Regions:
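Generic non-transmembrane alpha-helix signal with a bias for helix starts/N-cap capping motifs
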Residues: 1-2, 67
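Short terminal alpha-helical segments
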Residues: 3-20
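Acidic, low-complexity, intrinsically disordered interaction modules
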Residues: 15-92
Length: 95
């Protein structure tokens, strides 16, 4: 088991023992993309708050992209992470 992937999954409340190496890599990649998009959204939001950017909705777009990564984990693997997404809750009966 790749410890880097296992640690990444554990950080998000996901049990790595449920997944093979390939699945863990895919899940970890998705979480990395989430982190990148979330960081960009947060950075842009700070620029808005500081008056350095005008509000064109770009930060909401970036946050939506980040949220979509987490939702895709649920859709593709049935994974519910410890991340809360405003306006979305996983439906237990889908999986």
């Amino acid at each position: 088991m790749n410890n880097e992937y296992a640690d990444k999954l554990k950080a998000y409340g996901i049990d790595p023992a449920k997944y093979d190496e390939y699945e863990m890599e895919e899940i970890a990649d998705t979480l990395n993309t989430y982190e990148e998009n979330k960081a960009q959204a947060d950075s842009y939001r700070k620029e808005l708050e500081a008056g350095e950017e005008s509000d064109n909705g770009y930060h909401e777009f970036l946050q939506g992209m980040a949220d979509r990564e987490i939702i895709s984990l649920y859709e593709n693997y049935g994974i519910v992470t410890n991340i809360k997404i405003e306006g979305w809750e996983p439906t237990k009966n889908e999986h």
